[in-house]
Design a protein with these regions (language model features):
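PRPP-associated nucleotide enzymes
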Residues: 1-169
Length: 169
């Protein structure tokens, strides 16, 4: 699993990651590892580090939170942009924004508030539904952003729907 946090929640001990092409069978008789496929040169899916995995998980022996925070630190080192605040597209953009703010010495503020009862919008099949989903999912925290020059950190750009709606807020 790429979600080691699920093991934490149930009190299970993380032993190791399942290898590429491996099948692990768990029965009453024990655990058996099968590798029926030829070994290939696999590469990690970067979206696991920047978007899909929860920040309280580990992947490849690395903390997802620390990876995302370090992405923000590196981005701040490259950026010469000045602003009043740093904010993030919640939730997965938060660690990178925190890292960016720490490195740049620009204060972090919650500029967008997320409705946690709306799911991922980029997977919706129709643009109109995706746009409505973004509108329901995010709202500007006006007291934090009004009349401010903002650095907005997002973790990924899949379709651009979220970006366009946020700018209009």
């Amino acid at each position: 699993t790429s979600e080691t946090c699920s093991l934490d929640i149930i009190g299970a001990k993380f032993i190791r990651e399942i290898e590429n092409g491996e099948i692990v069978v768990i029965t009453n008789k024990g655990i058996k590892s099968i590798k029926p496929f030829p070994v290939v040169n696999c590469r990690p899916d970067i979206f696991e580090y920047i978007y899909f995995s929860r920040p309280d998980s580990e992947l490849g022996g690395k903390s997802i939170y620390d990876c995302r925070k370090n992405f923000g630190i590196e981005l701040a080192k490259e950026s010469k942009t000045q602003a009043d605040i740093v904010t993030a597209v919640p939730d997965s953009g938060m660690p990178a924004a925190i890292g960016f703010a720490a490195q740049s010495k620009i204060p972090f503020e919650l500029g967008l508030i997320r409705n946690h009862y709306v799911g991922r919008t980029f997977i919706e099949p129709v643009q109109k539904i995706r746009s409505l989903g973004v509108k329901l999912k995010l709202n500007a925290n006006k007291s934090s952003i009004k009349d401010k020059k903002i650095i907005l950190i997002d973790d990924s750009l899949v379709r651009g729907t979220t970006c366009h709606k946020i700018v209009k807020m």
